[in-house]
Amino acid sequence: MYQHIPIEMKLLLTYSDIDPAAWQSLVEQSSYATWFQTSEAYQFYASNPKEMIPFAYGIERDGELRAVVVGYVTKEKSALKQFFTRRAIIIGGPLIGEHATESDVEQLLRVTASELKSQAIYIETRNFNDYSKWKGTFEKCGFNYIPHLNFHIDTTSVELAQSNIGKHRWKYIRLSIRDGATMVENPTIEQVEECYDLLVELYSTK
């Protein structure tokens, strides 16, 4: 009697191979999700070719997208400076789904490192969530897992917030307010898009 043993099928994907609907679904269900791991973030990086070289890799197992990495390689105007300072930045950390295994994440990190080794002198993943569960996996793939401290500013009063921000930065805030800047609570989608358009223009001209 023959016994049927299911075989897991894994696919390593680049940006053009990743199904947009599967990507969006992964963003919606992952506890590690941030805007910086979305296809929109990739498109934002791609819209600024003078400053960034975008990349995105994903791993699909048994027909399900399990994890994605999105980031960019820094780009300098000077070829010499570019050669010595080029680095790959993954803002927010990897996007990991609830069904992803250690093998999935390890393979994704190894492929990312392999694909970028000729483009960057090192890879920096700026994790916005608690990835301590995956610390061993990161280290197995050659990453140094370095804890960092978030800075918190007490905003219980305007005076206290101002003293914690610092005089120099507060000066720029006051100048912005003088020039017409305002605080918007619960911005609309249109306002958020307008903000990103301004960022694109800023990165393109500065």
List the model feature ranges, each with a label:
Residues 58, 67-69, 121-127, 184-186:
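A structural signal for short, well-ordered beta-strand segments and their strand-loop junctions
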Residues 11-15, 28, 40-114:
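Conserved donor-binding loop and adjoining core beta-sheet/short helix segment
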Residues 74-76, 129-132, 158, 191:
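Short, solvent-exposed loop/turn segments at secondary-structure junctions
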